[in-house]
Amino acid sequence: MIKEAQDLAAAAFGADHTFFSIQGTSGAIMTMVMSVCGPGDKILVPRNVHKSVMSAIIFSGAKPIFMHPEIDPKLGISHGITIQSVKKALEEHSDAKGLLVINPTYFGFAADLEQIVQLAHSYDIPVLVDEAHGVHIHFHDELPMSAMQAGADMAATSV
């Protein structure tokens, strides 16, 4: 029954596979990070990542390479990372084992995920997406592109 439900969820989200997590999105995010990083490995992450990302980095022994998101000057909230910040990070750390993107951010801002995925893949770097606040975006054409639609390698969503 669980496998059937996971298969149905994968089909709904356009994913090859879906695995349910009893630890919520935090557990899934930690699994994603620890599946690509080991001791001393670099992972590119936005500075405003969820604490589960930092926990996974600590547990795996990886080294975070921070990309600073744009900050809204009027509201003081973070928008997300840009293609330019990702490009700079990839040029300086082409040996990174992964790139993590928040899509959408905790304030609802979406990255140009398709371009970011294409750029990271040109460096043979997998893209992991924290999509905890974007489970709905896959299901409407007028919403930003979901991680799976953009070609990301893994995504953690919350239902």
In which residue ranges do the predicted regions lie?
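Conserved PLP-enzyme active-site core in the AAT-like
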Residues: 11-12, 27-159
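Conserved N-terminal alpha-helix of the aminotransferase class I/II PLP-enzyme fold
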Residues: 1-27
